[in-house]
Amino acid sequence: MKPMRAWAARLILAASVSGPSLAADTFDLVSESEATAWNSLQPKEAKDFSTRDLREDDSAPTCHSTPDNDADNPQIRILAPPLGRPLTAPLDMDIQFVPTGSARIRPDTFLVCYVGLVTMDLTKRITDRVTVSEKGLHVTGAQLPRGRHHLLLLIADQRGRLGRREAVLDIY
């Protein structure tokens, strides 16, 4: 009987060691080397900020788009993680889009930008993993290095109005 128990114990130990890892479910939203580079490099030239009409040609916002401060702009709510307190990576993020009036949200205009001395578009790192809907999105396993990270989220509606939300993530 004892050899059978020892064999079962080895089997359970092997299964627990070779089981799925939490690391397999995470992805680098921003790597440590990127955060360092984006926060220390000087841009070669100033970028022009634009309030261009997003209704024209089904255009989408850029990391340098600014809203026209209209109260009727769509809203972006960050439901998780809780902002304003220390966080640990990996992060799960719940983002909700709130349309105004009868204009529907255009999910194809969703944009996430890392804002440092150099601004970088991170959208594809998220949209390759999750689907963005008119209601919002849920991201799991976003890895960020320790430090303070500024993200800018943008979304437009069918009338071309731009919603903008900034988030500061303090990772410890």
Task: Write out the residue ranges for each language-model feature.
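Short edge beta-strand/loop segments characteristic of extracellular beta-sandwich folds
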Residues: D92-G101
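Short beta-strand edge segments in extracellular beta-sheet folds
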Residues: V168-Y172
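Solvent-exposed loop/turn segments flanking beta-strands in beta-repeat/beta-sandwich domains
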Residues: T100-V112
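Surface-exposed, short loops/turns at beta-strand junctions within beta-sandwich domains
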Residues: G141-R148
